[in-house]
Amino acid sequence: MQYWGKIIGVAVALLMGGGFWGVVLGLLIGHMFDKARSRKMAWFANQRERQALFFATTFEVMGHLTKSKGRVTEADIHIASQLMDRMNLHGASRTAAQNAFRVGKSDNYPLREKMRQFRSVCFGRFDLIRMFLEIQIQAAFADGSLHPNERAVLYVIAEELGISRAQFDQFLRMMQGGAQFGGGYQQQTGGGNWQQAQRGPTLEDACNVLGVKPTDDATTIKRAYRKLMSEHHPDKLVAKGLPPEMMEMAKQKAQEIQQAYELIKQQKGFK
């Protein structure tokens, strides 16, 4: 009920013997209370909507990416399951993710329409959009390589989300560098099992994670590090609409950034 504040305000004014002007004042104060309460309720409703859309769209687009290569294989499904494991998805949340993945695999999946809807709901929250794209890039690279069809789909996603080709290519380099810090891809062994593809991080990998060059000075590197840590702060992302189920991935990404920064400091000799 959006008028309890007014009722209480008027009742208090009458009990205190405030007369006509007391009632008017109580009504105005109650009205302000009702408006504030209404805005708060609307914020929570929008937050839930944003989180639900982020969750569903993430797995729908993941399914669409997988299908773009052709037939969805058992290995593809295994990779998607691994990602769900990383998010600690169980029970109803996991079932919802699996259903969304199947929706995305349909031949007539409206990718551009879905991305426009997603961008509209995440308007003004570039860090959310960035997190979404990073998850999709990670999923596309999960088998150790980027299929041309997957790249084409990712370009469409980036375009619809307002991300330039140059920004997208930088994201790719950052994700490739992050793979060496535990954020990564999978590769199939001779026995048919999947394992993380790691050769050990280099200075170049670390710089790619932060989006800087090995020749950049300490000030530039520190600025890039602080900006990325702020954009990937798990609590901030959840407050802006990241589903709580994906908070673990945000934490892992923040850890990659931290590890990359520590390696750069060690290699370049600054504090």
Swiss-Prot record:
One of its GO terms (cellular component) is plasma membrane. Keywords: Cell inner membrane, Cell membrane, Chaperone, Membrane, Transmembrane, Transmembrane helix. InterPro entries: DjlA (IPR023749), DjlA_DnaK_co-chaperone (IPR050817), DjlA_N (IPR007791), DnaJ_domain (IPR001623), J_dom_sf (IPR036869), TerB-like (IPR029024). Residues 1-6 are periplasmic. It is found in: Cell inner membrane. It is a single-pass type III membrane protein. Pfam families: DnaJ, TerB. Its main location: membrane. The keyword Repressor does not apply. Residues 205-271 form the J domain. The chain crosses the membrane at residues 7-31. It comes from the Bacteria. One of its GO terms (molecular function) is protein-folding chaperone binding. Residues 32-271 are cytoplasmic. The keyword rRNA processing does not apply. The transmembrane domain is a dimerization domain. NCBIfam families: PRK09430.1. Homodimer. Regulatory DnaK co-chaperone. Direct interaction between DnaK and DjlA is needed for the induction of the wcaABCDE operon, involved in the synthesis of a colanic acid polysaccharide capsule, possibly through activation of the RcsB/RcsC phosphotransfer signaling pathway. The colanic acid capsule may help the bacterium survive conditions outside the host. This is Co-chaperone protein DjlA. It comes from Escherichia coli (strain K12).
